[in-house]
Amino acid sequence: GKVRRFAGQTPNSIDQRGDFPSMSDDFLRFLPLMRENCYICAEVIQIHVIMIDTQLYEYMMEMLRKTPTGFHRYLYQDIPWEAQLVGITGARGIGKSTMIRQYILGNQDKGRFLYVSADHTYFADHRLSDLADEFVKDGGTHLFIDEVHKYSDWSRELKQIYDVHSDLHVVFTGSSILDIEDGAADLSRRALVYPMSGLSFREYLKLFHKVDSPTYSLEEILAGKGEVTGIEHPLPYFREYLRKGYYPFSGEIGFEMRLQQVVSRTIESDIAQH
């Protein structure tokens, strides 16, 4: 339910309407702390403001805890994160979700950010637009919606959010290219949509072999100026990249099984619906 916690208190000691506690024993015990330390009081008030729903907050914190931070995809620096509406599209498993969570982790004002997945059970009986309304009322500034195509009528509600909340920054991702393309047509005047591919060879070398190779223009490559620095014989690495280097999870245990799952879900869920 909608519960906002004070530092060091449990949900049972908080008014279940989501407001500050009534004049109860718990609240009276809290008053000396407010008088003693205004800084702590300010921190508590901030916690009150940013927490919309316990299950969504806990889900976001768990996802952020699992997010690796040592490597960023090439697209990370190109995304205008402060634009009003941004979409990131691409195949399953290439790192879209990781990239937006990395941005949240790297932002000092992440207390006003909310990360949700459109297939979360919360949306079984809640509307996306209602969540945005409440989030803005609670002081939220950045809403990140993962796998947005899992939410029916997502493009219409994103248009509504865009038109109603001009100060809210929304970033959404989608893996179902067909669904995203259909919805993006409705959002063409509003959303900046960035396609994301799998790892490039340069990214593969940096992620798995710690080789940071510079980029070269086509003219430089044709002029023979481009070379893979840090590796004396790059061809074996390139063959390895062609075999399994497209996905960031290729170095994990069970890569083949997970790759098969990605292919199956793409065929059975994304393509079959069309």
Model-derived segments and spans:
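Interdomain hinge/linker elements that couple catalytic modules in large macromolecular machines
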Residues: R35-E36, A42-M61, K206-H274
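Pre-Walker A adenine-sensing motif
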Residues: M63-W81
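Hydrophobic anchor at the beta1->P-loop junction of P-loop NTPases
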Residues: I88
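Conserved lysine of the Walker
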Residues: K96-S97
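Short glycine-rich substrate-engagement loop in P-loop NTPases that contacts/grips substrate
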Residues: G111-G139
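Structural recognition of the conserved hydrophobic beta-strand(s) that form the central parallel beta-sheet
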Residues: H169-S175
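Short regulatory helix/loop adjacent to the ATP-binding pocket of P-loop NTPases
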Residues: L178-V193, F208-H209
